[in-house]
Amino acid sequence: KLHFDPSELPESKQQEVEDQWQSILSKLELPKDKYQLYFRKFDMGANAMALPDGSIIVTDDIVTLMEQDPNALIAVLLHEIGHIEHQHSLKMVAQTTATTMLFAMMFGDINGAGELILGAGTGLLQTAFSRDMEREADEFSHKNLPKFDISPAAFADAMTLLVNSHSASFKSTDDEDAATEDATNKDSNSKIKNSLNHWLQYLST
């Protein structure tokens, strides 16, 4: 299970990122009461995640990692907003619920299905978005970065920082871990390449 603790970031740093967040919402004309940013200490390193209700969690490690490159953090926040705007989390809840109900009807455990459905929300935190969903969120970030006078290459910078951070802490103790790391790096490298292509298009406009 994923474990979150209260943030240990200085209040001044949290306020700095919160100000960035509010600026993003204003620029994109998004409802500030719907989109909430939360800081948490996370035992699995630098990360950010979007929840169905519009909440976005950023870990202490990702804020620290991108402290010297605020544009990279903005690119990540836009990516997470993209997940919410495309309702990816809600779609995953719907898929999980439908699958749960199907199995419940097949095996006659309707009562147990209720508990599983209630657990679907927390399960989202442990389930990766599909590649198509990730691609849509990437595109949302690429498309909106220029609105802040930021090159789409900032997303590539963010992914590079994350890849290097997680590679440094990844413990490849067996073949399965090594395969997982390799697959993660391939996906990340694909994201970086796509982001740089957007950057070239941006320069040509």
Explain the meaning of each model-derived region.
Residues 1-205:
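A Zn2+-metalloprotease active-site environment signal
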